[in-house]
Swiss-Prot record:
Belongs to the MinC family. GO terms for biological process: cell morphogenesis; division septum assembly; regulation of cell septum assembly. This is Probable septum site-determining protein MinC. Cell division inhibitor that blocks the formation of polar Z ring septums. Rapidly oscillates between the poles of the cell to destabilize FtsZ filaments that have formed before they mature into polar Z rings. Prevents FtsZ polymerization. The keyword Cell division applies. Interacts with MinD and FtsZ. It comes from Ruminiclostridium cellulolyticum (strain ATCC 35319 / DSM 5812 / JCM 6584 / H10) (Clostridium cellulolyticum). Signal peptide: none annotated.
Amino acid sequence: MDENSVTFKGTVNGLTIILKNEPEFSEIIQCMRDKVNSAGKFFRGAKLAVKYKGRILNEEERSQLLEILVRESGARIEAFEEDKEQVQNVANNVSSDKPVERKNQIKKYMFFKGIEEGQTKFYRGTVRSGQLVNFDGNLVILGDVNPGAVIEATGNIVVMGLLRGVVHAGSDGNKEAIVVALGLNPTQLRIADIITRPPDEKGVVGNPIPELAYVKDDILYVERFLPTR
């Protein structure tokens, strides 16, 4: 495996990942995982805005790389998107007066930072595979969270729909945070530093049942959510 298939480059604003075009994507995945693990001390606890360049990725490939960063780096990933500043002929520093046009450009990761609107942010719509929704406070999703999507908040997370992606509440270490969803079937559920995954056989069948996830004595519990009136 070519160790240079994936190169990490620290920048003033975060991290740039340079991906080679030639290797199979399985090699990119393995190299990415190795690089993340070897840089664990650098990433752990950091807040990173990440850009990638050098290789055009489809939605599924972007989703896989994002999951590696979120699950294995120990960092809080605040953005993950294609580098918009890639210019033709970078190697010989030749600038061009003509704009770089890309027809049928692959849709980039959509990223929602959250505007200062108080302590709770409402996100309206479905969070799709490859999207990262992150907020410093409580987060309410008015829609579904699809597999391959990632939602994070330093406070509580409420999903008014089916939650089937990666969810991280209390991302700043707050173990008092909770996760509530009308249908709770995430690929990964995390509160503070406590992580769990659903059993393989679990699935949302028929009418979903609202559920609540919380931490008590460093154990993550999931139970039916029956709010009192």
